[in-house]
Amino acid sequence: LAKRKAGGEEEDGEWRPPATQKRQKAGSEAESADCYRSPFRKPLTQLTNRPLCLDSSQHEAFIRSILSKPFKVPIPNYKGPTGLRALGIKRAGLRSPLHDPFEEGALVLYEPPLLSAHEQLKIDKDKVPVHVVVDPVLSRVLRPHQREGVKFLWDCVTSRRIPGSHGCIMADEMGLGKTLQCITLMWTLLRQSPDCKPEIEKAMVVSPSSLVRNWYNEVEKWLGGRIQPLAIDGGSKEEIDRKLVGSMNQRGLRVPSPILIISYETFRLHAEALQKGSVGLVICDEGHRLKNSENQTYQALNSLNTPRRVLISGTPIQNDLLEYFSLVHFVNSGILGTAQEFKRHFELPILKGRDADASEAERQKGEERLKELISIVNRCLIRRTSDILSKYLPVKIEQVVCCRLTPLQAELYKNFLKQAKPVEELKEGKINVSSLSSITSLKKLCNHPALIYDKCVEEEEGFMGALDLFPAGYSTKSVEPQLSGKMLVLDYILAVTKSTSNDKVVLVSNYTQTLDLFEKLCRNRRYLYVRLDGTMSIKKRAKVVERFNSPSSPEFIFMLSSKAGGCGLNLIGANRLVMFDPDWNPANDEQAMARVWRDGQKKTCYIYRLLSTGTIEEKIFQRQTHKKALSSCVVDEEQDVERHFSLGELKELFSLNETTISDTHDKIKCRRCVNGHQVRPPPEGSDCTSDLSQWNHCADKRGLQDSVLKAAWDAAVTFTFHHHSHEEQRGIP
């Protein structure tokens, strides 16, 4: 060990601080100056450029000397200014796209023209267009038809399909992923363009109120945390106005919530606030709501300041030519001219050519104008059918089940036909639209006599003395399935399904009163159920659907009011669906039936469409399936019946055929059946989208594929049409 000197220096001359005296406790002896120090402690080294003792002025001077040293750029020979924000040298070169267009599986929406080496030298580097490539996060999950759809949408809204027009109609059938395609379009437009900057700053989705939360969830699902949508699904008028004004005032590249999701009703009520700003793109879900250009919603949306419009409609565009015009005019104003020009150039010649008394020249002119119209519309409309789904989804078996009326229903039905005024008026050749509300009474009677019991008690028109027909002691407090043919069949279907499988069932009806009966039946049978109708809040709907779809959920039945937003709901937790009553508009029934057979479904799906044999329900169903010419249109409400039915057809509505096993089968004059029994199978290649005459026809249960319906046959089934979506599952789900 080095010997230490008294002054704090060692023999080798190294400096160390002198020893300091520690404060001693009172009463203790002071230590000597030469106190013991550990020989292992390393001595401190003095800073050569720092004074030994610093006063405040010296300290300040020392800090200033450090800060005043010039900043040295860590790049050799760099002579540029150091005060700019840019770090390092800006490298000259062409701009690059956001995602690699040459990566395997890349979905390229725009490919810039190739530049020669000479052109690359001459062109302004900041003006060279770049590839527009869909984010790989989305392109990896898009199916082939969806990739094609996204390309079509992008071409339309960027005016590449129709110069000067920026709109299109996405009319794919239900279940083909229209929502995902539109989310992909929005995300691409919000992030990139050929000009190497976002094409739009903001997008807006307008949908039925029941789908606002669904859209929000879908954006979250596919984009994760990459974007924060704003969904307006509740709150006071002032609160909603404040949110909307704030959203419309947002501008720039970094808008906090670039996607606004709002319902048609809220949009209409707050149109003034929304029209103060501009939006890069508006998407209208369930766009067939805009088929009437006179209604307030159409006009409010049409006045929104937006160049790009996409209209989604899974429902086939109805056969009314004016609906064609309204929808196309909304997305691409002017491509079909004004309403008057459209009527003169297209509608009148086409309708005249369709007339039974048209001359050959008129017929030919009508066909030419129709082809011209279709060629224009097809430039901004894309439609694919659900046939594509057969590659990805399990088999769907669709069944139209005719159920005989019970004796009570038959007596009440005949009693009504004898008394009701519409029947008398029709015999005299008169049509009173207001009296046609009695159609609703007949439809409810077909569901269950309990639904018209109050009318019988009050002896309303058509139900005089009908109370005597009910069994003694009858009460509406308890459901009695044996009093309704359809309810009896439903009771069997539910019981057999519950006892033989772990399948779940969706029950759909047009009437909330019928849902009340379903509830009573479920309570009697101790089935767990959930119910969605117009009284349920939007937020609660989303939670109920999510819970029902969970495999661990104990609910067996999901009750759905078709009027309360059946469209857009994803109910893949169930694989059996019962349409308890038909709707005048086939689109409504199609919407409801598409709830279970859609992306994510793993089980074979069974659809049951129940009809009361020989009644008004079969007439409504025939109306749905009958292929009409362009001049006819679909009945939306019962008040419109007079406009769509001839006197003879109306007379037929008010009739009951008690001897038939299926009035619908009688009407199609089937050549494959002998004495009601099918002797030849359906044509090869036919499926459940084919005409009803090409389905399987069963007058007994021998030809049925569904074991559940076989077990329920003897309850009250008289006849069944059935067919499948495809032979077997193809491809991978």
UniProtKB/Swiss-Prot annotation:
SMART domains in UniProt: DEXDc (SM00487), HELICc (SM00490)
Q: Which part of the chain is the Helicase C-terminal domain?
A: 488-642
**Keywords assigned:** Acetylation, ATP-binding, DNA damage, DNA repair, DNA-binding, Helicase, Hydrolase, Metal-binding, Nucleotide-binding, Nucleus, Phosphoprotein, Zinc
Residue stretches making up the Helicase ATP-binding domain: 159-334
Q: Where is this region: Disordered?
A: 1-35
| Residue list for modification N6-acetyllysine | 504
Annotated EC? 3.6.4.-
Which residues does ATP bind? 172-179
Q: Which residues carry this modification: Phosphoserine?
A: 561
What's the protein called, per UniProt? DNA repair and recombination protein RAD54-like
Q: What is the lineage of its organism?
A: Eukaryota, Metazoa, Chordata, Craniata, Vertebrata
Quote the gene name from the UniProt entry: RAD54L
